[in-house]
Design a protein with these regions (language model features):
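C-terminal alpha-helical cap of glycosyltransferases
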Residues: 311-327
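Donor nucleotide-activated moiety binding/catalytic core segment of transferases
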Residues: 220-261
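Catalytic binding pocket for nucleotide-activated donors in carbohydrate/polymer assembly enzymes
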Residues: 254-307
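Active-site and donor-binding regions of nucleotide-sugar-utilizing enzymes
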Residues: 33-166
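Conserved catalytic-core segment of nucleotide-activated headgroup transferases in glycan assembly
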Residues: 41-45, 165-167, 173-226
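N-terminal export signals
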Residues: 2-26
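Short acidic-hydrophobic, aromatic-tinged amphipathic segments that line or gate anion-handling sites
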Residues: 76-79, 231-236, 282-292
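Short loop/turn segments at strand-loop or loop-helix junctions that form parts
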Residues: 93-94, 113-118, 162, 179-187, ...
Length: 327
C-alpha cells in the first residue's frame, strides 16, 4: 500500500512535466486514424483527445458509416472513403473492423494499442494484422501479456500506462456510498455484452436494503432504464469512484484504474464471464451469489502493491509515452 501511495504522489509532479512536454507540440502534427473492435463506440478514444491536441495531432476514428454516430460527439469520425490522409493507423483489437481497415489502408503504417481489455486467446484475424504492426503498446505489464496472447505474438509490447491515470481524482470517500459498475447487458451493432447483469442487479438490491447508498457508474452502452431506480452518476465511473467507500461490478477495463484511485473493488463473476485474470486480481473478492454482496463490500480491501502495479502500469506521463511510441 505504501508503494502505491508513493506512485500516486508522483502523479502530480509527472503530470506537470507532461503538460510542459506536450505544450511545445511536435515538429509536424501527426494525423492518426483509429479503428476499434466497437466501430461506433468512441469512449475509448475520447480520453486521448486533449493530449493529442496539445501535441498538435489529430485523431480520427474510422466508422463503417455515419448512421450510429452520436450527434455532438467530440471524437472526429470518418468512413474509410472519407478519411483524411494519415501518418498512422492505430488498431485497438483484431476484430473484423480493425482487420478490414488494415487491409483497406495498405500503405499506412500500423500500430496496435490496447484501449479495452482483450481475452488472452488469439483472435481469428490477428494473423492478418501482425505483419503490419510497427509498434504494440499496452497500459500495464498484465495487459501487455493478455494483449500479446490475443494478437498471437511474443514481440515486445511497450508498457506506457493509461492516459486516464495522468489525472486521477483525489479520493474522498463518503460513508456507506457504494459505486455499482455496470457492463453491457445486451449486445448491439457497436459491440458485444458481458454476462452478469442479473447478479449485479440482485447484489445492488441487497446493498440498498442493507442501508448502503448506491451510485451507479453506467457503461456508455448500457440500458439506462435497468438502473433508473438508483442514482446514476453524472460523471465518469473513474471520477465517481473517488467518492465511494467501495465499488462492485462486472470486471472490466476500468477496474484497475479505480483501484489506482484507492477504491477497493468486488467483482460479480457470472460463470459465463470471460475476462483476463488481472481484472479479477485487483478485486478484493469475487461473488457468484447476491447474498455475498454486503459482506464482500464491508470487508473490501485493495490488492497488494505488486498486484496493483502489474495491473495498472506506470502512473504519470502516460499520454506523452504513448504519443512518443506513435511518432
Amino acid at each position: 500500500m505504501r508503494a502505491m501511495k508513493s506512485l500516486l504522489s508522483r502523479r502530480t509532479v509527472l503530470g506537470g512535466a507532461l503538460a510542459v512536454a506536450l505544450g511545445g507540440g511536435s515538429a509536424r502534427g501527426r494525423r492518426i486514424l483509429v479503428a476499434t473492435n466497437e466501430p461506433w463506440a468512441t469512449y475509448h478514444v475520447k480520453p486521448l483527445l486533449a493530449e493529442a491536441a496539445r501535441h498538435g495531432w489529430r485523431l480520427t476514428q474510422l466508422v463503417p458509416d455515419y448512421a450510429k454516430v452520436t450527434p455532438g460527439d467530440p471524437v472526429p469520425v470518418a468512413t474509410p472513403a472519407d478519411a483524411p490522409r494519415a501518418d498512422l493507423l492505430v488498431v485497438t483489437g483484431a476484430g473484423d473492423w480493425p482487420a478490414d481497415c488494415v487491409a483497406r489502408f495498405r500503405r499506412t503504417r500500423v500500430a496496435a494499442r490496447a484501449l479495452a481489455y482483450q481475452v488472452p486467446v488469439e483472435a481469428p484475424r490477428a494473423k492478418e494484422i501482425r505483419p503490419r504492426l510497427r509498434v504494440i503498446t499496452a497500459s500495464s505489464p498484465a495487459e501487455a501479456r493478455a494483449f500479446g496472447a490475443y494478437l498471437g505474438t511474443k514481440r515486445r509490447i511497450e508498457v506506457v500506462g493509461s492516459p486516464q491515470t495522468d489525472d486521477l481524482p483525489q479520493r474522498v470517500p463518503e460513508k456507506d456510498l457504494v459505486l455499482v459498475l455496470t457492463s453491457v447487458t445486451h449486445p448491439d451493432g457497436t459491440g458485444s455484452a458481458a454476462p452478469g447483469t442479473e447478479l449485479l442487479l440482485a447484489a445492488t438490491e441487497r446493498l440498498a436494503a442493507a442501508g448502503k447508498r448506491v451510485l451507479v457508474g453506467l457503461h456508455p452502452r448500457e440500458n439506462r432504464r435497468l438502473w433508473e431506480k438508483y442514482e446514476i452518476s453524472s460523471v465518469s465511473s473513474l471520477a465517481a469512484s473517488a467518492r465511494a467507500e467501495a465499488a462492485i461490478g462486472i470486471p472490466g477495463t476500468v477496474f484497475p484504474l479505480i483501484a489506482a484511485v484507492g477504491t477497493p473493488l468486488v467483482g460479480c463473476t457470472d460463470p459465463a464471464l470471460s475476462v483476463p485474470d488481472y481484472l479479477r486480481a485487483v478485486c478484493s473478492s469475487t461473488i457468484a451469489d447476491a447474498g455475498q454482496a454486503v459482506a464482500a463490500i464491508v470487508s473490501a480491501r485493495l490488492p497488494d502493491a505488486a498486484t496493483l502495479a502489474d495491473a495498472v502500469g506506470p502512473i504519470g506521463g502516460s499520454a506523452r509515452r504513448l504519443l512518443t511510441e506513435w511518432d
